[in-house]
A protein has these predicted regions:
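Terminal accessory/targeting
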Residues: 1-52, 67-76, 191-231
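A broad, low-specificity signal for short, low-complexity segments enriched in glycine/proline
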Residues: 9-15, 36-40, 64-65, 103, ...
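Active-site beta->alpha N-cap acidic-glycine motif
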Residues: 29-111, 115, 119, 123, ...
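Catalytic domains of cell-wall/extracellular-matrix polysaccharide-remodeling enzymes
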Residues: 110-231
Length: 231
C-alpha cells in the first residue's frame, strides 16, 4: 500500500489523457429537487465531495477499500442494506470503527417507488433498528436502492428523521467492469459539493486510489455525505 499514491498518480495521467473515447456515455444524475429532503448535490460553495459507497454485496472487497481510505486519511459514507448487515455485523462494525459514516439503504433492496407506504416504512425502520442495535448509532441519511423513490418514500423517510440522498454522478460500477471507465466517471467534471455513487466491486477497488488522488490533487476534499451537504 506504500506505493499506492505514486501508482495512482501515474494511472490518473494515463487515463485522463489517453481515455478519449468511451463506449458507454458518462452518466450524471444532477437535477434540482423541489423537495428539500431529497439531495442530489451538496454545498457548492466549498470544495468538499463524497465518494459514497452503497453496500448490499461485495463484502470481500470492503476490507481493502477501507485500507485505501485509511491510506489517504479520508472518511466517507457507507449506505448499508439491512439484510447485508444482518449477515455481516462484524464488517459493518469495522466500517464504523474506522471512522466512516453509516447511512440507511433499506432492508431488501426493493424499488421504493413500487411498494406501499407501510412497506416503505418497514424497509427503512427495520434497517434503522438493526443498525442501532448492532452499532449503537442513530442515522439520518437514507439512500433508496437503485435511486427509486416517490413522494411516499420521501414522506416516510422524512417522518423517520431521514433526508433522502441521491447522487450527482453515478459510476455504474455494478454493471461496467472497467477500472478506467470507473475512474473517468468518478472524476470527469468533478465539482464542489458532488456526491459520487460507488459500490464495493473488484474494479472499484482497483480504481479507488486513483480517484481519491485525483480529487486531492485537484483541490477537492473527499469526506462524508453529511459534511458535503452541511449536516
Amino acid at each position: 500500500m506504500k506505493k499506492v499514491r505514486a501508482i495512482a498518480n501515474i494511472i490518473i495521467v494515463a487515463i485522463l489523457v489517453g481515455l478519449t473515447v468511451v463506449a458507454i456515455p458518462f452518466t450524471s444524475s444532477v437535477r434540482a429537487s423541489v423537495n428539500p429532503n431529497v439531495i442530489y448535490q451538496g454545498d457548492t460553495n466549498n470544495n468538499k465531495v463524497s465518494f459514497m459507497i452503497n453496500v448490499y454485496w461485495g463484502t470481500e472487497y470492503l476490507e481493502d477499500m477501507l485500507d485505501v481510505f485509511d491510506l489517504y486519511q479520508i472518511k466517507t459514507t457507507f449506505f448499508v442494506g439491512g439484510s447485508w448487515v444482518a449477515k455481516n455485523v462484524e464488517m459493518a462494525q469495522e466500517i464504523y470503527k474506522r471512522g466512516h459514516e453509516i447511512g440507511n439503504h433499506g432492508y431488501n433492496h426493493k424499488d421504493h417507488d413500487k411498494i406501499t407506504e407501510q412497506q416503505n416504512y418497514d424497509e427503512i425502520h427495520k434497517t434503522h433498528l438493526l443498525i442501532s442495535a448492532n452499532l449503537g448509532i442513530e442515522m439520518n441519511l437514507f439512500a433508496p436502492p437503485s435511486g427509486a423513490y416517490n413522494d411516499t418514500t420521501v414522506n416516510v423517510a422524512t417522518g423517520l428523521g431521514y433526508r433522502t440522498i441521491m447522487w450527482t454522478h453515478d459510476t455504474i460500477d455494478w454493471r461496467d467492469k472497467n477500472t478506467d471507465l470507473i475512474i473517468k466517471r468518478a472524476t470527469k467534471n468533478l465539482s464542489n459539493g458532488d456526491l459520487i455513487l460507488m459500490h464495493p466491486t473488484k474494479h472499484t477497488l482497483e480504481a479507488l486510489s486513483a480517484i481519491l488522488a485525483y480529487a486531492e490533487n485537484n483541490g477537492f476534499q473527499p469526506t462524508t455525505v453529511s459534511e458535503v451537504i452541511g449536516e
